[in-house]
């Protein structure tokens, strides 16, 4: 449980393991249930296009997300994958939603073992492919 008392649903954990171990999904978007007591799966996708994932993030509401980010390593070293955790809190979301999502994040983040990078986004430019790639490159030492 988090500081806000929010729990992570079994469905949320299963979906993550399906993404991480089974490669069943490319992305998962999580939300708080209506009672704000549990983090649940909002949607999953097998779509490879990163732009499609970003388009699934709501313009005016908060979400958590996980994306299996694939990128090219320089000097012809091939492709790599990192599981990226997103805390999506757009500037246009209500202050209450931002506060509840911020105080509940740790419960989900701690439950998801195997996250390579964490991204906090308040607008779409912060979750753009190039921005995320730059952060991954900094954290892995690839340039």
UniProtKB/Swiss-Prot annotation:
Entries under CDD domains matching the protein: ADF_cofilin_like
Major subcellular site: cytoplasm
GO biological process: actin filament depolymerization; cell division
Pfam families membership: Cofilin_ADF
Domain of life: Eukaryota
Record localization: Cytoplasm; Cytoplasm, Cytoskeleton; Nucleus matrix
Gene Ontology MF annotations: actin binding
Domain annotation ADF-H: ranges: 5-137
Assigned keywords, A-Z: Actin-binding, Cell cycle, Cell division, Cytoplasm, Cytoskeleton, Nucleus
InterPro entries per the UniProt record, alphabetical: ADF-H, ADF-H/Gelsolin-like_dom_sf, ADF/Cofilin
GO CC aspect terms: actin cytoskeleton; cytoplasm; nuclear matrix
Record family assignment: Belongs to the actin-binding proteins ADF family.
The protein's role, per its UniProt record: Controls reversibly actin polymerization and depolymerization in a pH-sensitive manner. It has the ability to bind G- and F-actin in a 1:1 ratio of cofilin to actin. Binding to F-actin is regulated by tropomyosin. It is the major component of intranuclear and cytoplasmic actin rods. Required for accumulation of actin at the cell division site via depolymerizing actin at the cell ends. In association with myosin II has a role in the assembly of the contractile ring via severing actin filaments. Involved in the maintenance of the contractile ring once formed.
Name of the protein in question: Cofilin
Gene it is expressed from: COF1
């Amino acid at each position: 449980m988090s500081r806000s008392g929010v729990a992570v649903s079994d469905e949320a954990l299963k979906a993550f393991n399906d993404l991480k171990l089974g490669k069943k999904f490319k992305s998962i978007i999580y939300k708080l249930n209506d009672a704000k007591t549990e983090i649940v799966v909002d949607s999953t996708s097998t779509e490879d296009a990163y732009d499609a994932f970003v388009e699934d993030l709501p313009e005016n509401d908060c979400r958590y997300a996980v994306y299996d980010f694939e990128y090219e390593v320089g000097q012809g070293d091939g492709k790599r994958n990192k599981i990226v955790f997103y805390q999506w809190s757009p500037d246009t979301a209500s202050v209450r939603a931002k506060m509840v999502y911020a105080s509940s994040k740790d419960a989900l983040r701690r439950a998801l073992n195997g996250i390579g990078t964490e991204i906090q986004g308040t607008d779409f430019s912060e979750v753009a492919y190039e921005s995320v790639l730059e952060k991954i490159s900094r954290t892995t030492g690839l340039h």
